[in-house]
């Protein structure tokens, strides 16, 4: 059953927590940075897996870790990006959800907390990702706590401007010179 939640995923009572990651070993922003600070052993295992090129889109890296506030947890590192500089892709979410479903069933995970996969720093549309999660996981025997983006994050996503990168600036100059 899917439960829709707002708040801090790291405070969840769920048996497993999903951490959105890239495949290069960097947890520098967003929820990944929070996981890095809260679960240092998970970060060490994840970084080592990335250094060995074992972290791939569609594969979950599951680590048992604990801290003083949450106790023992299964941390499910879910790759939503190949590199921290690049955006997420819907195909990455789809592949990951298939793998996540298998892990939940194989490990008999009774409850899991999931953030808005690839929808903040990854740039994906939350409503589309939410629908993908519902289609993939709603029929399994597990309490799924789906943490929706806060209203402030949704508003920021709507109004966030496209950044002017050097490549975009060159393209604009090229069009300006054509006139």
Label each residue range with its predicted role.
Residues 1-179:
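Macrodomain-like recognition of ADP-ribose-binding/processing modules
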